[in-house]
Amino acid sequence: MPNSEPCVSPLELFNSIATQGELVRSLKAGNASKDEIDSAVKMLLSLKMSYKAAMGEDYKANCPPGNPAPTSNHGPDATEAEEDFVDPWTVQTSSAKGIDYDKLIVRFGSSKIDKELINRIERATGQRPHRFLRRGIFFSHRDMNQVLDAYENKKPFYLYTGRGPSSEAMHVGHLIPFIFTKWLQDVFNVPLVIQMTDDEKYLWKDLTLDQAYSYAVENAKDIIACGFDINKTFIFSDLDYMGMSSGFYKNVVKIQKHVTFNQVKGIFGFTDSDCIGKISFPAIQAAPSFSNSFPQIFRDRTDIQCLIPCAIDQDPYFRMTRDVAPRIGYPKPALLHSTFFPALQGAQTKMSASDPNSSIFLTDTAKQIKTKVNKHAFSGGRDTIEEHRQFGGNCDVDVSFMYLTFFLEDDDKLEQIRKDYTSGAMLTGELKKALIEVLQPLIAEHQARRKEVTDEIVKEFMTPRKLSFDFQ
């Protein structure tokens, strides 16, 4: 809602959001054009931001506003916090620097991954911390100290992460949780379960069941190409595994019984027009957090804690999971949260597989990578070479530099690039060239590994079985 209309009441805003939400859903259901849907979604986000600015809290479906919240939060640094919008489906901010993650930690009630925790992980594993930890890419956690306590006392835990297979080709941003999860599996030597939520994508997207399942299998090949240990990793499709495992389905039903419709409406913004499959799906994403969902691996034990590496937008699912866990007699899962991988056009939103120009795909050729980076990567450089040499570039908003923080292993080289670009010694074209030289071999090597993943290997990873780990 434009700022020039201060007469609009919070209740009117609330009703406008509900109406706009219905419009978005009807456009999606009616297979409207992408531009039309995107425009409606942007209007919905704008209305929600205006509501938060007026009320001091997020919009919640079926919770009409009472009196407006105090306006003391409208200070000089309030704007970015009010304009950050994060949920499992949408990530949006007006800041070129991206989401304010410190404020997101406060809003979500998680804990910052500080130097002390990173040092403790290093002591426990005897390994140098992964660059994602060193650089704050994994920046937030829930109960990681508890996992380390268990590990140091020789008590087991397992890893759980996942992928929503919405397309055949994955982009480089999708690799982030898997690169880090592989490192965790290697340094802690623990089993891993990977959920492919093909059922979710069928419910949310215009896909057939067969398409959703085929995407799950194709995406599994990219995940396997990250190098996971076949003896310690189980990848499963929800559409497959739900019918195979009574332990998994029993946990889904337990969770469903202990979470109300009102709770999921408050957490996820569901409305009366959403299909019942969407409303019950969070229980399916929650169930792998409990070890007896995998009796073939954990022998019906219920006391083995789970550690979930994921992007911060998935946290609402696991806040719900952690809330319900003690009520059904299970330990709460621990979490490690990552930042978002920005779109080529800037950090205002995360990279999307639906927009080919916003993404570097794992199927892209060396030429396509070069063209996309040179043509579309948002620059923090100046308008002219003379100005850039004099004033330097801005690494905080430059997408090429952001990508290097994810993929360039050498800390010293990254710091030198930062200094050279900030001082003006390095030009935007040179920075983009440095990124291209990192991305091209990384993706070519991934493609070579993926070619070696046969249908038989996928089947073995996706077959329920005992893993090579002895739980005492």
From Swiss-Prot:
Its EC number is 6.1.1.2. It holds the Pfam family tRNA-synt_1b. This is Tryptophan--tRNA ligase, cytoplasmic. It is found in: Cytoplasm. CDD domains: TrpRS_core, WEPRS_RNA. Belongs to the class-I aminoacyl-tRNA synthetase family. It catalyses: tRNA(Trp) + L-tryptophan + ATP = L-tryptophyl-tRNA(Trp) + AMP + diphosphate + H(+). Keywords: Aminoacyl-tRNA synthetase, Angiogenesis, ATP-binding, Cytoplasm, Ligase, Nucleotide-binding, Phosphoprotein, Protein biosynthesis. GO terms for molecular function: ATP binding; kinase inhibitor activity; protein domain specific binding; protein homodimerization activity; protein kinase binding; tryptophan-tRNA ligase activity. Residues 9-65 form the WHEP-TRS domain. The modification Phosphoserine is found at residue 352. Proteolytic cleavage generates 2 forms; T1-TrpRS and T2-TrpRS. InterPro entries: aa-tRNA-synth_I_CS (IPR001412), aa-tRNA-synth_Ic (IPR002305), Rossmann-like_a/b/a_fold (IPR014729), Trp-tRNA-ligase (IPR002306), uS15_NS1_RNA-bd_sf (IPR009068), WHEP-TRS_dom (IPR000738). SUPFAM superfamilies: Nucleotidylyl transferase (SSF52374), S15/NS1 RNA-binding domain (SSF47060). Homodimer. Interacts with oxidized form of GAPDH. The modification N6-succinyllysine is found at residue 155. A motif ('KMSKS' region) lies at residues 350-354. GO terms for biological process: angiogenesis; positive regulation of gene expression; positive regulation of protein-containing complex assembly; regulation of angiogenesis; tryptophanyl-tRNA aminoacylation. A motif ('HIGH' region) lies at residues 165-174. GO terms for cellular component: cytosol; nucleus; protein-containing complex.
